[in-house]
Amino acid sequence: MEDFLLSNGYQLGKTIGEGTYSKVKEAFSKKHQRKVAIKIIDKIRGPEEFIQRFLPRELQIVQTLDHKNIIQVYEMLESTDGKIYLVMELAEGGDVFDCVLNGGPLPESQVKALFRQMVEAIRYCHGCGVAHRDLKCENALLQGFNLKLTDFGFAKMLPKSHRELSQTFCGSTAYAAPEVLQGIPHDSKKGDIWSMGVVLYVMLCASLPFDDTDIPKMLWQQQKGVSFPPHLDISSECQDLLKRLLETDMTLRPSIEEVSRHPWLAST
C-alpha cells in the first residue's frame, strides 16, 4: 500500500479515521505540495452489497460535487490488490463531534455560522439531485471557521422525474428520522433535514435530543417532541427551527429551501 502511494507521489502519515471497510490517513502530496487525506477502501473485505451498490454510487457522486462546504476529492486511484484510494482535501480542525465532546455546547452565534454552511452544502446537494443519507457530527469537518461535509458512502442520486421513496436504512441510528427507523417508504431529502436537526441540537446542547440506546423508547420520545435544557438559554427562533427540523411527520418537515429562509438563519 505505502509503495503504491509513494509511486503516485503520496507520503503516508497517521490514521485519522476508521470505518467498517475503510480508513482515512493523513498524507503529503508531492504533486499538490500540501497535506491531504486519503480514504482507503478495501474492496476485498467489503460485503457484496457495499461493493456492488454503495461504493459505485459514492465514487460517482464525490467526483461530481464541487462546493466550498464539501470536502473536495482531488484524485481516485485503484491498486491491483483491490484497494481504492480517494485523495481528498484535509480538514485539520477535526470534526464537530470531537469539538463538542472536548469543549461542550457551542455558543449559539458560532453554531449559527456553522449550521448556515451545512445548509448551503445540503442545498447544493439536493439541487444536484443528491441525498447524503448519513449526516452526523462526525461527518461535518472543521477547517478554521469553515464547515465541510464528508463521507458520501450512503449517498444516493435521486430520480428527477418523480419523488423518490426509499425503504433503505442508511446512516446512524441517533441521526435517523423516525420513518427511516420504522422502514416506512420515505423521501431521502426529508431524512437529511431530520439529521440536520440532530446535528444542530448536538452543537447547541452537547447531547443527543433522543436516547438512541433503546429504539422503541427513542421513537416514543420523538413523537413527544424535542425539549431543551433551560440553562442553555437557546433563543426562541432557534428552538422554532429545531422543532421544524425534528418534525416526526415527514410531509410537514421543511425542504432545504424552506430551512434556508428560516428567520433564525436570516438574522445576524
Language-model segments: residues:
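A short, aromatic-enriched beta-strand patch in the conserved N-lobe beta-sheet
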Residues: 75-77
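Activation segment signature within eukaryotic-like protein kinase domains
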Residues: 114-115
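Glycine-rich ATP phosphate-binding loop
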Residues: 23-44
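Conserved short submotifs of the Hanks-type protein kinase catalytic core
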Residues: 82-95
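Protein kinase glycine-rich loop
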Residues: 13-19, 24
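Conserved N-lobe beta3->alphaC-helix segment of eukaryotic protein kinase catalytic domains
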Residues: 40-65
